[in-house]
Design a protein with these regions (language model features):
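Conserved glycine-rich cofactor-binding loop
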Residues: 8, 15-16
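Residue(s) in the substrate-gating loop at a strand-loop-helix junction
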Residues: 142
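Active-site helix of classical SDR
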Residues: 124, 158, 166
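Short C-terminal tail/terminal secondary-structure segment
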Residues: 3, 147, 224, 235-251
Length: 251
């Protein structure tokens, strides 16, 4: 029931990292994929080439700079013009700067809330507007939306907002046969993570019940389930994929 043959999916922020892992998993399940990136680059073309080797469905690219909210409508207008509506939307694109509250400017806050919260809201709105037969929306949130980390107050707030927006939009869009769910990833392995944040990685490995970092595939497998017909009676849900870290007592 996790087969996606005949489905078309748009994954934002999908040239690398979690977004690419999700796009790859959906392709492997039979979906036709639209990769999204801010601008064209060798990395985007390489991502497209890697996915194209896995499918005969074709892989396309949607470019849109999310610092401009108008790009959301532009992406969906192009999809409509191509006369190939999408069935699945994964709102993955986000930013995660580290900044102490005392050093935070109003522009820092505005940028964070615009890209991490306003853009997924607008993408959801246009998905619903252009949808012909319903579908599935998945918001990639963070465990920081549940338990914040030091110097991440604006990031944690944006993700907490997205978790609640998931529930609110699921309530509103159910009558249109649109399901909306979210995933809260834990610490996911990436290149140079142990060099960029050695103490954080060390602490995670000591505390996490499964004693490992997450991988992109861990999030991708959860994403596949939630956007597929296997989850046809699930909407407004938030799935925590963190190796059990949420269970660790803080006392």
């Amino acid at each position: 029931m996790t087969e996606l043959t005949g489905k078309r999916a748009l994954v934002t922020g999908s040239k690398s990292g979690i977004g690419f892992a999700i796009a790859k998993r959906l392709v492997q399940a039979g979906a036709e994929i639209i990769l999204h990136a801010r601008s064209d680059s060798a990395e985007v073309e390489e991502a497209k080439m890697k996915l194209a080797k896995l499918t005969t469905q074709g892989v396309s690219i949607a470019l849109g700079d999310f610092s401009d909210p108008k790009s959301c409508r532009s992406i969906f207008e192009k999809i409509k013009k191509d006369n190939k509506p999408i069935d699945i939307l994964v709102n993955n694109a986000a930013i995660q700067p580290v900044c102490a509250l005392a050093d935070m400017s109003s522009s820092d806050i505005s940028q964070m809330l615009e890209i991490n919260l306003q853009i997924p809201i607008m993408m959801t709105r246009y998905f619903a507007e252009y949808s012909e037969k319903g579908g599935s929306i998945l918001n990639i949130c963070s465990i920081e939306g549940l338990t914040p980390a030091l110097n991440h107050s604006h990031y944690a707030s944006s993700k907490a907002g997205l978790i609640n927006f998931t529930k609110a939009s699921a309530l509103e869009l159910g009558s249109k046969n649109i399901r909306v769910n979210s995933i809260c990833p834990g610490l996911i392995e990436r290149q140079n993570l142990d060099k960029d944040w050695p103490q954080g990685v060390k602490s995670w490995l000591e505390k996490a019940p499964l004693k490992r970092l997450g991988a992109g595939n861990d999030i991708a497998n959860a994403a596949l389930f939630l956007v597929s017909d296997a989850a046809s009676f699930i909407t407004g849900a938030n799935l925590v994929v963190d190796g059990g870290m949420e269970c660790v007592p803080s006392w």
